UniProtKB/Swiss-Prot annotation:
Subcellular localization, as worded in the UniProt entry: Nucleus; Chromosome
Gene Ontology molecular function terms on file: chromatin binding
Quaternary structure note: Interacts with pof3 and pol1.
Comp. bias (Polar residues): 340-352
Chief location of this protein within or outside the cell: nucleus
Function: Has a role in regulating DNA replication complexes. Acts as a regulator of post DNA replication initiation. Associates with chromatin during G1 and S phases of mitosis. Required for the transcriptional repression of the outer repeats of the centromeric region. Acts as a polymerase alpha replication accessory factor and is important for S-phase DNA damage survival. Plays a role in lagging-strand synthesis and Ozaki fragment processing, in addition to DNA repair.
Pfam families from the UniProt entry: Ctf4_C, Mcl1_mid, WD40_WDHD1_1st
Region feature Disordered, mapped onto this chain: 306-362
Record protein name field: Minichromosome loss protein 1
GO BP annotations listed: DNA damage response; DNA repair; DNA replication-dependent chromatin assembly; DNA-templated DNA replication; mitotic cell cycle; Okazaki fragment processing involved in mitotic DNA replication
Lineage per the UniProt record: Eukaryota, Fungi, Dikarya, Ascomycota, Taphrinomycotina
Domain of life where this protein originates: Eukaryota
Primary gene name: mcl1
Amino acid sequence: MAGNRLVPRYAHTDGLTRLAYTRDGKFLLTVGSNQVIRKFQVGSDEEPDSIDNHQDPITGIAVAENYFCTCSEDATVCVYPIDSPTEHTLLARTTLPIRDVAYSVDGNWIAIASDETAVKVVSSTDSSQIFSLRPAKASNKHVTYSPNGNFLAVSSCNGILYFYDTQTRELIKFLTNTIASLEAESEICSKAAWHPKNGTFAVASTDHFVSVISPDDWLPLYKLLPKENHSGVTDISWSSNGMYIAASFKKGGILIWDTQSHEVVVELPYSTVVALAWQPFENVLSFTTNQGILYSCPDVIPKSILKEENDPTKPLTSSKSKNRTSKELDDLFGSDDEQSQNVNDLDGNSANEENEFINHDGLDSSLDLDGDSYMVDENDLNLAKKRKQKALIDRTTTIENGSSKRRLLQASIHKPVHTGSTPWQGNRRYLCLNLVGFIWTVQQDAEHNTITVEFHDETTHRKYHFVDDQKFEMACLDHEGALYASPATESSPGVIYYKAHVDWSRKSEWAMALPMENESPVTISLSSSVVLVCTSAGYVRVFSRQGFPISIHRSKHLPFVACSSFQDTIITIANDGLSSDGNSRLVYSIEDISRDEMLQTGDGVALPPQGTLESVFFSDVGDPYIYDSTGVLLVLMHWRIPGQAKWIPVLDTNELERRKSRQESYWPVTVADNQFHCILLKGASRYPYFPRPMFTEFDFRIPCNTNNPDASTSVPVLEELQLRNKLFLTLLEDSIGDGDVTEDEKISIARLEANIDKALLQLIQKACLEERIERVYELTKTLRRTTSIAAAQKIALHHSLTNVAEKIGNLLSNV
């Protein structure tokens, strides 16, 4: 049956999947990144039961006699009765995403591996019974119990395999140079897969073999050699009789070995497999892919070679392993001296501190993540404690001439806007969301939150987490690092904290307490050159990326609403009295930090009547944009020339064709490649939520006329097209200014001029057909290239419009 095509069952969406059979083999359970549990009845073609409980991708599943449990990136472990899985129980919660769970043999305990440094072990019936194992300052990827109940194996992300005695809870052995060092989210497997009967275990070794190791002497019994072009083990699973072992590979498919002959007996050419499970007591192998597809292969071992039971007389340790030289053993596991030293130094503790590996604190105990590296200096904190708490931003709204006037002015103050952030939804919120990635925070308790930083391009940077003792309320993210800010409190000052993504020495990490009494960050921004902080004290503070102060000035307009930055250019937006409709009037200022030059000062932000500001940002080429509450995107043109700047609408999302048939809105992200990048919000939703939202891009369409999208060459479409390209050309020419023009810029200018003239010539053609002489001549005068004017003359002559052709000829002679 292994050679026949298997029937796929689409269980989940793309992403990591896991599966497990119940111990009686009657049901097959799968989990995946779409937060859904599927319960398949073995041998039935009926639709599986679906259980939707977790908020984030499910990363692991384990099965006991009558129950099963799941874990998720939402940092929870839930337990379900197999017979009625909808009646789930939330058993445990950690501070960071959970990667794996495992039941003890008797089903009384559940081990939890997470991005925390501690492995938690919780009673499956009483969540108050819990203890922690702390092997090292690294997160953990897998946990597995030996079938005899003696050992708990922990696979750490640092490439060390730890073994604990389940009775004494003591660390009894750790193996180095055995498994690979991996990221927590990696599909590659580093778990210890236990033989169902004889006590040995298999691992994907660092040399790309599958090694079978005996805990009697912790030496490899034998190694299973994969076929050529097979690499990257994603899972390992033993058959229920222990006679066969299957391994899935990231490249190459699935291989099954006979554990006595050590030869490959079955090869299944299925790619992207990430999880394997043998059906108990049956010759059936099931597996899932990272595309969410489930396959089951009956009679996977051909009956002609099928072996029913392992030879009970076969010794656990081969003579070959007993005859290894001391050098070979040192190469495999390190010398005895190194082992002894590593045990002593495993968590930075001396030998007499090894009992600290066992921690009986609860799940929400503080983690030793070196989080104090960005804490504020003690002197600053002591100074802040002596200060009396005062009102921050709302202080500016106080008027002492009557409560009605106070209410009027308070209503007119535009609230601060931080581009890319969302309000709290439950216990989590996005601090920053842009084209680089996401930063979100999760409330844990009154003392701290946890922050996760994730990237769209995981090949550049990997996702990471840290414990947030400052309870940051704002963040900015770019390719090099992240900027955070927290407000002043009664006991501490406002804090600015910068953290580089890749900085093992932490020399690029810095923190700063704002010096003024009760001074809080109101809005912040991060560019490739500067850190910008606008505060409740009215100061615009500019720092270098290394925390060196560059400039400071007090704004003429308060309180601040928003800010943004691009290279050495910054824009700040603030309140400035009331507009004619009774709402707050917003003004902006633009400054070139490198030249210490104010380009625009106190000019108005072009908001519609009763409208508010939703977002402000620079595009990928450095032009300022705003997005207002009515769904209109505007760009600031001529902003480098003092007094000449004006806001040009480039897209009205209310006029999008898709908007006519859908109830949706658009949450702004940025502008890149002359496209509006946003997140679609369905129904009455105002903000994106979890799981991670997808981006959508819209081309600009200047609202200059009634556009008909069904006719790409209609007059309204062509009129808008030439106007849009003219805008792009103006923005490009403004950015060049009096500087030298590069070859790429020359090419871009020529392309835009050609696009403008092409649209105009099509309009001239239509005007000639309608014999609109004055319009033909008017359009011809706007052409930019001599060749285009000559083409317009030919079009006029083609339509026998000799008078206008003569006028066009006069234009040519004057060019």
